Structures are given as structure tokens and as C-alpha cells.
Amino acid sequence: MKFSSVLKQSAKYAAHVPKSGVFPRGFQVGSIASGVKKNGNLDLGVLVNTNKSYESSAASVFTTNKFKAAPVILSQRVLEEKNGKGINAIVVNSGCANSVTGEVGLQDATQMAKLIDEKLGATSPSTLIMSTGVIGQRLQMDKISKGVSQLFANNSFGSDFNSWLNIAKSICTTDTFPKLITSNFTLKNGTQYTLTGMAKGAGMICPNMATLLGFIVTDLPIESKALSKMLKFATDRSFNCISVDGDMSTNDTINMIANGAVKTDEITEDSPEFLQVRDQVTQFAQKLAQLVVRDGEGATKFVTVKVQNSSTFADAKIIAESISNSMLVKTALYGKDANWGRILCAIGYAKLDNLDSLQTDKLNVSFVATDNSEPRELKLLVNGVPQLNIDEERASQILALPDLEVLVDLGTGNEEAQFWTCDLSHEYVTINGDYRS
């Protein structure tokens, strides 16, 4: 199954792709089919900050995979050298990951960024790089260079809806729909601002950054250290709380740029608006991350795993992750099998920081319907005791829903965490069995 047909035929496209939007001031985006992708789809995108009245701030969260791709290594260097200030562009390609490509890969990534810097007249490196696609293949820099030249020569940049939608399309690989969201927010002091985000990912998705590329931009002025803290907090509760298949990629990157086009006081960690913006960014990032799971390769279900009343947030998250990554749980969900023993097993082998977080005689596990049908909650385990007379018909009804929740109550504290995952189907094997072709 080829991506070109997947994108056109996807029923998810109509359900999750916006038809309009308002975008942050002071940004322009462009995209082009450079030829890196064999199918002729858009595969090169550039985002540019055009606001010169404020020195932009940038922050990133990168993969923890030991085999970091060249664009990850180079972007980390640029951010460190610039202390998160003066980053004015992001260039991204799909079709080739430029990963495990050695010194020549770093040279290609450097050249890719330099192409943009030169077009913008930058006197020092100010471009972040992102790549996604097949690992171990060298980037076709002749095509990238020609594509960049055409983008700028034809002035193929815009701030309209179609321009933003097309750059979201340009980063897709096995995705069945481009992931683009934009929202307006109002601070308590009356300041209005906008967040726009896009992401790609449908497979090789597992926390601590998987095959997941994304960026969020805003027209708020945010100090670089405050922005970094916001993004880390948001990522820990969004992009690091999703799982499709448990595989961690070499390229994951989430970038965020604040260009200060909104005329208001710069937000720092000490600003009264800091927590409000941080929480708004977190909720926004969660919506964007959830789209990745909804587009999980071959997925038929979107599943929220909620772990509540834990002694710590960390342990609640560890348990939610363990359940979300379990292949046996995911296949049971696909088969509509109310096999709660698999959930219990995944809870039991979770590598907790604090063993007191899990006490078997306080544990409760339920399936929860999300369509407002009753009974909404079907209890499977109560205070460690299995419910022997489970309504199997009701269980089948809940498990047949496209959206459902697995609820775990530890009864040992007041902290909670959520993970978002999907089922594992035959189609996942089909997609990944011929990915390179």
C-alpha cells in the first residue's frame, strides 16, 4: 500500500483535517515536491519567521535513541550555540531520514540548513533541520538544493490556510492525513495569541520521542528559558504519552518557536501568565499528539489509558505506558476481547520508581465507554478482586467503539497520568512489511 493512495482514500482525512484556520502573525511557510519521494508528493517544507521586531525564542525536545540522526545532532548544536535565541526558520524533508549516515550525513544536514540561512541573509546559523523517512540512506542533496532554490525563486511562501496545510502534507510518510491544528487563546490580561502546530507520525511511535516530527509556533513573546520549560512540561504530558507500536525512532523532534509578533510583555518563568500559557501549550500539544495515535498504522481504535490515584505522577505514567505498549493488550483490543488479565499483567511488570504506588488489594480496573451509553463504566477488578459476573455483551459493546478508555485506579495517592494508544491490526503488518517499496 503506497502513501499516495493512502492519503487520498483515508476516511480519517475528512474527520481530522481542518478546512480553515487563523495562524500566528509573522510566519510564512512554503512546500514543494523536490523529488526525494518517489511518488511525487510534497516532500520539502520551510517555515520562516518574518517578524523582525523581536528576537525569536526557540526550544526543542529530541529523541533519546542512541543513534541520533544527523538533523537531530545539528539542531541540538544550533540551539546550544544560540542559547535558544534568533532561530528564524525550520526546514523539513520527508522520504529520507538522513539517519545512521555518518559524517557525510552531518555534512548534508549542515548544507541543508545553510541553504535556508543564505536565502534569509542570516549571518550565523539560525535554521533547525528535521528529516523523516527510511534510515540508512543518504539525503539527495541535489534535489533538496534545487527544491529550496525553486521555493525562494518563485516566492512560494504564504500565511494562508492552504500554505499551512501543504507544509503539513510535506512531512507525511505513512500518514493517512496531515496533522495540523491551530487555536486562538486569551490570557487573563486580555492579550490574544495564536498557537499553530503540525506533526507527522503513524508508526514507530513510542514515548521519549518516536518517529514523530512536529513543530509548534506562536506569536507570543516568550523568553527562551521559559519556552524550553514550557515545551518540556507539555511534551512529557503529550508527545511522550503516546504509543502506536513501542518502537523509538532516531529522528524524533518537537520544535517550538515564539516570534513575539504580539505586542505584549515578554513572558518569563516569573510572569503571572507563565502557568496559564504553559497549560494552554500542554493542552494544545495533547490534541496534536492524539492525532498521531488516531492515525496509527492500521489502527481501528483510539484508546485512552488513564491511571489515577497514584502516589506519584511518574508511577502513574509508567503504568499507563506499560499498558499502552503491551502487544497482547493491543491485539485484544483489536479483537474486541475483554481479556483484562493482559492489562493486569502489564500493570504488574511496570518498572515503578516507588513500589508503594501499586498495592494489589487497592487496585481497580475498568473499561469506560466514551459515547455516553450506559452503564458508562464496566468494572473488571475491584480492590484486587476479579468481577466474576462481567456483562460480556456490554464489554463487547464498549470494545467495539472507535474511542474507548481503560481506567486504572491505584488507590494509593492523588496523582494521575494519561496515555493514548491504539489497537494492533493485520493492516499494521501489511504497511510495515513493504515500507521501503
Swiss-Prot record:
Pfam families, alphabetized: ArgJ
Cellular component annotations (GO), alphabetically ordered: mitochondrial matrix
UniProt KW keywords: Acyltransferase, Amino-acid biosynthesis, Arginine biosynthesis, Autocatalytic cleavage, Mitochondrion, Multifunctional enzyme, Transferase
Pathway info: Amino-acid biosynthesis; L-arginine biosynthesis; L-ornithine and N-acetyl-L-glutamate from L-glutamate and N(2)-acetyl-L-ornithine (cyclic): step 1/1; Amino-acid biosynthesis; L-arginine biosynthesis; N(2)-acetyl-L-ornithine from L-glutamate: step 1/4
Oligomeric and partner information: Heterodimer of an alpha and a beta chain.
GO BP annotations listed: L-arginine biosynthetic process; ornithine biosynthetic process
Record PTM: The alpha and beta chains are autoproteolytically processed from a single precursor protein within the mitochondrion.
The family this protein is said to belong to: Belongs to the ArgJ family.
Other remarks on this protein: This protein may be expected to contain an N-terminal transit peptide but none has been predicted.
Function, as annotated: Catalyzes two activities which are involved in the cyclic version of arginine biosynthesis: the synthesis of acetylglutamate from glutamate and acetyl-CoA, and of ornithine by transacetylation between acetylornithine and glutamate.
Family matches, as PANTHER family: ARGININE BIOSYNTHESIS BIFUNCTIONAL PROTEIN ARGJ, ARGININE BIOSYNTHESIS BIFUNCTIONAL PROTEIN ARGJ, MITOCHONDRIAL
Protein name: Arginine biosynthesis bifunctional protein ArgJ, mitochondrial
Residues where substrate binds: 173, 200, 211, 297, 432, 437
Catalytic residues in the record: 211
Keyword Chaperone: no
Main subcellular location of this protein, as a coarse class: mitochondrion
